[in-house]
């Protein structure tokens, strides 16, 4: 019976020690990512910026600083109308923030941006695929995006339902008016 007590004590000791060790490693990793992110933000030499960005997003891909860098890069590329490269960055962000221990907020932002860009590029099936995770979503904008993608693939009946869901959930009258225009546009083609 002494063996069992010693075994339990050892297991608990190793578990607690392992937990604190992993937390320390995680803390050090976040601190290193923070330094890289801050350096990336202030560096003006393009080659240095790119090297810092690659280091941050490849070696610290599961940190919030890497997610922020990818979000900023993807958004900047989209503003410059470099949609193909932008969507690649958002796919990387989606992959890095996905999963059980991922960041669902960042993942949702990445998916929304992928869908928006896919629709702009005419890749409606890709938009639907990336939004599939949100099949029961309560967000009005997600319903609107699904409606846009469904319209693009010619499924006007489902698009109309998505637009109606968006219309019901939007609180802002300007957004409601925009969705109402989309609904009216679909109804004129019936």
Task: List the model feature ranges, each with a label.
Residues 90-95, 136, 156-174, 184:
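TPR/TPR-like (Sel1-like) alpha-helical repeat modules
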Residues 1-24:
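Single-pass alpha-helical transmembrane signal-anchor segments
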Residues 4, 58-66, 95-107, 133-142, ...:
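Short solvent-exposed coil/turn linkers within tandem alpha-helical repeat scaffolds
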Residues 31-64, 72, 76-79:
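Alpha-helical segment of the N-proximal tetratricopeptide repeat
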């Amino acid at each position: 019976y002494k063996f069992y007590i010693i075994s339990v004590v050892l297991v608990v000791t190793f578990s607690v020690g392992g937990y604190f060790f992993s937390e320390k490693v995680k803390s050090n990793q976040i601190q290193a990512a923070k330094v890289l992110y801050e350096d990336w933000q202030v560096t003006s030499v393009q080659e240095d910026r790119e090297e810092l960005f690659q280091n941050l997003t490849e070696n610290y891909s599961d940190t919030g600083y890497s997610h922020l860098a990818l979000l900023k890069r993807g958004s900047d590329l989209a503003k410059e109308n470099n949609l193909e490269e932008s969507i690649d960055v958002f796919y990387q962000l989606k992959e890095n923030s996905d999963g059980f221990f991922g960041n669902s907020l960042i993942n949702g932002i990445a998916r929304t941006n992928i869908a928006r860009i896919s629709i702009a590029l005419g890749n409606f099936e890709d938009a639907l695929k990336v939004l599939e995770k949100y099949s029961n979503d309560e967000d009005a904008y997600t319903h609107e995006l699904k409606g846009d993608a469904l319209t693009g693939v010619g499924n006007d009946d489902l698009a109309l339902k998505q637009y109606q869901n968006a219309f019901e959930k939007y609180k802002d009258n300007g957004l409601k008016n925009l969705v109402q225009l989309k609904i009216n546009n679909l109804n004129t083609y019936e």
